[in-house]
Swiss-Prot record:
Subcellular location: Nucleus
Organism name: Homo sapiens
KRAB domain mapped to chain residues: 4-86
Name of this chain's protein: Zinc finger protein 844
Gene from which the chain derives: ZNF844
SUPFAM superfamilies recorded: beta-beta-alpha zinc fingers, KRAB domain (Kruppel-associated box)
SMART domains: KRAB, ZnF_C2H2
Swiss-Prot/TrEMBL keywords: DNA-binding, Metal-binding, Nucleus, Repeat, Transcription, Transcription regulation, Zinc, Zinc-finger
């Protein structure tokens, strides 16, 4: 039958753990160890109660050197006196087994059973000084990186593994790594629940009392280890040692592949995964693998939506501790980030924005414009702005153009919009364009297309209700004008105007013609109706005709073809709703001086493609056109209410239409 060794049943404490025990626990420990020694037949060393506290006051001593070892019968030393007699034990009142050899220390005179016990005791007496105990044939194990000496080779091997980052044993449940097999065995007891000491708070089982006491600090928040330099407290002695290296700058753990040094072995071990590409932590739900355990823990909370870190002041919960630390700064009012260039203290988010001011970093650049463009544009509500929008596209500009554009609500702006397209401008152009509600602006819109302009043009246009303006509308088409023309065109309600209607087509006019035409009920005007066809007239013609019921007059109407003087035309349209495409409110090709057009867009909801309300190309003098459209809802394509091609002087035509409801196509 094999004898039981003391290593199999002994429980060891570190210096920090022994200091945490109260006197009753220390007395209990002494009694248990004494009873254990009495029951072991292979132990013959003297037991002294007073040496227990001395052992834990001296961290270099091993408890087993005070309690004894198994008898080493195979080795002999010259300084040991061999004896076959039984060694009396005053404390245990027992005799050792026959044939036990005793060894006496030459330093202090104590007698030990076995050479290994004596050798450990000599190291304790000489305090790890190799010059004093080399005579006994013992070579100390020194670490070349930290210059630390070890008593036995296994401890030295563990230290070497720590420096190289080699950890052979990983816990699959919590991700911790261990150097020795015994360490992971003790650790697995906590997960399996086989330990004798169970935590009152969480129910975890600990294999021994020392681990149980250390585990309790997680719940109690006890931090007995304080840094002498900064006063920071820690729960574990190893954490304090790693923290002290931040003050000294010591980084003993170096990576062999890249040469990077670290202050703790765990940091080195995790760093090695960047070279090997190892990702040991895999999510069971989605299969995603992670290199670090804390990243794996944060990822698992995305599936469970668990927020384990809660703010003590406001109760807000977070998924990871880094978010909680940033949140706690908002309560304390501290600004941890300080700018090294200007010394300004900022929060984490504002610090990143602040550093761009010093570095002059501009990550957002326009691909089409080389020079910077300054536009004071105020957007109150912009929700769905998308790609490639150029609110002002200026290709060749000599002087800057300042365009204040306040947009109250802009929800649906889309791609490639150019409200103002200026190709070649010599002087700045000032265009106040207030848009209250713009919801449906779409692609390729050019509200003002100016190709060649000598001086600035101020164009205020008032449109109260424009809901259905469509493509290519030209209510007034003036090709060549020598003097300005004044056309007050009030449109009350425009409902049914359709394509290609020319109520008055004046080609060549010498003198004015006054034609008051009253159409009370015109519902069904049809095609090719020419009530008055005058080809060549030199003097004015006064025609007062009352048409009470004209229902089927249609398009291609030319009441006046050729005249030499002005024609004054006032066209009030009460009900005009369906004006359609090809409308140009003012088409002037060549302009030398200013053109003033006041614009007010109150409700523009469905503006569509290729609209040019003002196309000014060639004109010699100013054209002042005031267009008041009260309700224009359904304007349609290619309408030219006034088609004046060659005019020498002003044309004034007064034609009141009371009810025009059913004008139709061609």
């Amino acid at each position: 039958m094999d004898l039981v060794a003391f290593e199999d049943v002994a429980v060891n404490f570190t210096q920090e753990e022994w200091s945490l025990l109260d006197p009753s626990q220390k007395n209990l420990y002494r009694e248990v160890m004494q009873e254990t020694l009495r029951n072991l037949a292979s132990i013959g060393e003297k037991w002294k109660d007073q040496n227990i506290e001395d052992q834990y006051k001296n961290p270099r001593n091993n408890l087993r050197s005070l309690l004894g070892e198994r008898v080493d019968e195979n080795t002999e030393e010259n300084h040991c006196g061999e004896t076959s007699s039984q060694i009396p034990d005053d404390t245990l009142n027992k005799k050792t087994s026959p044939g036990v050899k005793s060894c006496e220390s030459s330093v202090c005179g104590e007698v030990f059973v076995g050479h290994s016990s004596l050798n450990r005791h000599i190291r304790a007496d000489t305090a790890h000084k190799p010059s004093e105990y080399q005579e006994y044939g013992q070579e100390p194990y020194k670490c070349q990186q930290r210059k630390k000496a070890f008593r036995c080779h296994p401890s030295f091997q563990m230290q070497e593994k720590a420096h190289t980052g080699e950890k052979l044993y990983d816990c699959k449940e919590c991700g911790k790594t261990f150097i020795s097999h015994s360490s992971i065995q003790r650790h697995m007891i906590m997960h399996n629940g086989d330990g004798t000491y169970k935590c009152k708070f969480c129910g975890k089982a600990c294999p021994c009392l020392s681990i149980y006491l250390i585990h309790e600090r997680v719940h109690t928040g006890e931090k007995p280890y304080k840094c002498k330099q900064c006063g920071k407290a820690f729960s574990y002695s190893t954490s304090l040692q790693i923290h002290e290296r931040t003050h000294t700058g010591e980084k003993p753990y170096e990576c062999k592949e890249c040469g990077k040094a670290f202050g703790s072995p765990n940091s080195l071990y995790e760093h090695r995964r960047t070279h090997t590409g190892e990702k040991p932590y895999e999510c069971k739900q989605c299969g995603k693998a992670f290199r670090w355990f804390h990243s794996f823990q944060i990822h698992e909370r995305t599936h469970s939506e668990e927020k384990a870190y809660e703010c003590t002041k406001c109760g807000k919960a977070f998924k990871c501790p880094s978010y909680l630390c940033r949140h706690e700064v908002t309560h304390s009012g501290k600004k941890p980030c300080e700018c090294k260039q200007c010394g300004k203290a900022l929060s984490y988010l504002n610090f990143q924005r602040h550093m761009k001011m010093h570095t002059r970093m501009r990550p957002y650049k326009c691909k089409t414009v080389e020079k910077p463009l300054i536009l004071p544009v105020r957007f109150e509500d912009m929700k769905e702005l998308t790609l490639e929008r150029n609110l002002m596209n200026a290709s060749t500009v000599v002087k800057p153009s300042i365009v204040p554009v306040p947009f109250t609500i802009m929800k649906g702006l889309t791609l490639e919009r150019n409200p103002m397209n200026v190709s070649s401008v010599v002087k700045p152009s000032f265009l106040p364009l207030p848009f209250d509600i713009m919801k449906g602006l779409t692609l390729e819109r050019n509200r003002m297309s100016v190709s060649n302009v000598g001086k600035p043009s101020d164009l205020p246009h008032t449109f109260k209700c424009m809901e259905g303006l469509t493509l290519k509308r030209n209510p007034m088409n003036v090709s060549s004008v020598v003097k300005p023309s004044f056309f007050p065109l009030p449109f009350d309600i425009m409902k049914g105007l359709t394509l290609e209607r020319n109520p008055m087509s004046v080609s060549n006019v010498g003198k004015p013609s006054h034609l008051p035409h009253t159409f009370k009920c015109m519902k069904g005007l049809t095609l090719e109706s020419n009530c008055m066809n005058l080809n060549n007239v030199k003097k004015p013609l006064d025609l007062s005709e009352t048409f009470k019921f004209m229902k089927r007059h249609t398009l291609e109407r030319n009441p006046i073809r050729n005249m030499e003087k002005h024609s004054t035309i006032s066209l009030p349209f009460k009900y005009m709703q369906q004006c359609t495409e090809d409308r140009m409110p003012m088409n002037v090709k060549s302009v030398t001086k200013h053109s003033y057009l006041p614009r007010s867009f109150e409700y523009m909801q469905e503006h569509t493609l290729e609209r040019n309300p003002m196309n000014v190309r060639n004109a010699e003098k100013r054209s002042i056109i005031f267009l008041l459209c009260v309700y224009t809802k359904g304007c349609t394509l290619e309408r030219n209410h006034i088609n004046v091609r060659i005019v020498g002087k002003h044309s004034v035509c007064l034609v009141p239409f009371v009810d025009i409801k059913g004008l139709t196509l061609e």
